[in-house]
Amino acid sequence: MAEFPSKVSTRTSSPAQGAEASVSALRPDLGFVRSRLGALMLLQLVLGLLVWALIADTPYHLYPAYGWVMFVAVFLWLVTIVLFNLYLFQLHMKLYMVPWPLVLMIFNISATVLYITAFIACSAAVDLTSLRGTRPYNQRAAASFFACLVMIAYGVSAFFSYQAWRGVGSNAATSQMAGGYA
């Protein structure tokens, strides 16, 4: 029968040390911001903010078309913020069971289609809802322009998301080194 050792080395830790380790693991990946996906998401956030800020500064609640534009712009802006933070802090790697390339492709295609409808609604309603040369007219026209730009940005993201989903132009080594968002 083996004897029980007289000396046992133990190591204790406090709960604060464990919490500190999980907070330090949540560091931003600045390589993501320099990637195509990160740059396009930042562009979508800036342009989307311009769209809904310009519309929100007019009496949009009087016209249903602008209610739709506001819904699309704010909803997609918020979802893009969530996705941007998931990728910035590499939280998508912790949720490995989610097929992120497929999720991004579906989101970007849906966002493109929604922004197409918002752009058409916004630009078609400019002349009908305000007098040419007035401040609301200029804001709504500018919102139409930025809605077109953000629609193009989501379209480009949809194209790159489709390529990432299909695995076009990458191999296992480069996609691992680039963190999956080359």
Swiss-Prot record:
One of its GO terms (cellular component) is membrane raft. Residues 57-68, 121-141 are extracellular. GO terms for molecular function: identical protein binding; structural constituent of myelin sheath. Phosphorylated. It comes from the Eukaryota. Residues 32-166 form the MARVEL domain. It is a multi-pass membrane protein. The modification Phosphoserine is found at S9. Its main location: membrane. Keywords: Cell membrane, Golgi apparatus, Membrane, Phosphoprotein, Transmembrane, Transmembrane helix. Forms oligomers. This is Plasmolipin. It comes from Homo sapiens. The gene is PLLP.
